[in-house]
Swiss-Prot record:
Pathway: Amino-acid biosynthesis; L-leucine biosynthesis; L-leucine from 3-methyl-2-oxobutanoate: step 2/4. Heterodimer of LeuC and LeuD. It comes from the Bacteria. GO terms for cellular component: 3-isopropylmalate dehydratase complex. Its EC number is 4.2.1.33. It comes from Escherichia coli O127:H6 (strain E2348/69 / EPEC). Belongs to the LeuD family. LeuD type 1 subfamily. Catalyzes the isomerization between 2-isopropylmalate and 3-isopropylmalate, via the formation of 2-isopropylmaleate. One of its GO terms (biological process) is L-leucine biosynthetic process. It is an enzyme of class 4 (lyase). This is 3-isopropylmalate dehydratase small subunit. The keyword rRNA-binding does not apply. Gene3D superfamilies: Aconitase, domain 4 (3.20.19.10).
């Protein structure tokens, strides 16, 4: 069972770029592993580092700014997670420490993969995201409160409402991924299998 997501308060980092694709999130040369850990070191590798080996940080990239170290909420622009359908993208984001991504829109496959990996993708309007960028840029180090149960983001003096599909919301709040959902019916599955002829087992 995955970690339950109900509420999260975290430091916000503003990535002011639209159409951030999955190859930018986790470049293809780092996709050899099939486990979910270790990808955070290569998150935004071509932007975070000046060298291919990822040993020389790029001082001009926002994730490297001192005031955003330890950020767990990523604020982005429209069509986040576009490009190829690699599940490694949410793996890299969560392994780095992100719990929430806020953007006006997400690529469909990335959006679904995020829920499967307990990464909450929050959709707000363009105008609301503009407000949040202005707020973060005026208050570096600001924290947002994200409440999945209430479907609200509290930022500064304002509260922003978002909507999540009821089934996905239930799964995240109960720490259920695809395997967890199946295991909820373990007794019924076992009972069904016991009733099958021996040659079908």
């Amino acid at each position: 069972m995955a970690e339950k997501f109900i509420k999260h308060t975290g430091l916000v980092v503003p990535l002011d770029a639209a159409n951030v694709d999955t190859d930018a999130i986790i470049p293809k040369q780092f996709l050899q592993k099939v486990t979910r850990t270790g990808f955070g070191a290569h998150l935004f590798n071509d932007w975070r580092f000046l060298d291919e080996k990822g040993q020389q940080p790029n001082p001009d990239f926002v994730l490297n700014f001192p005031q955003y170290q330890g950020a767990s909420i990523l604020l982005a622009r429209e069509n986040f997670g576009c490009g190829s359908s690699r599940e490694h993208a949410p793996w890299a984001l969560t392994d780095y420490g992100f719990k929430v991504v806020i953007a006006p829109s997400f690529a469909d496959i990335f959006y679904g993969n995020s829920f499967n990996n307990q990464l909450l993708p929050v959709k707000l309007s363009d105008a609301e995201v503009d407000e949040l960028f202005a707020l973060v840029q005026a208050n570096p180090g600001i924290h947002f409160d994200v409440d999945l149960e209430a479907q609200e983001v509290k930022a500064g003096e304002k509260t922003y409402r978002f909507t999540i599909d009821a089934f996905r919301r239930h799964c995240m709040m109960n720490g259920l991924d695809s395997i967890g959902l199946t295991l909820q019916h373990d007794d019924a599955i076992a009972s069904y299998e016991e009733k099958q002829p021996a040659f079908m087992r």
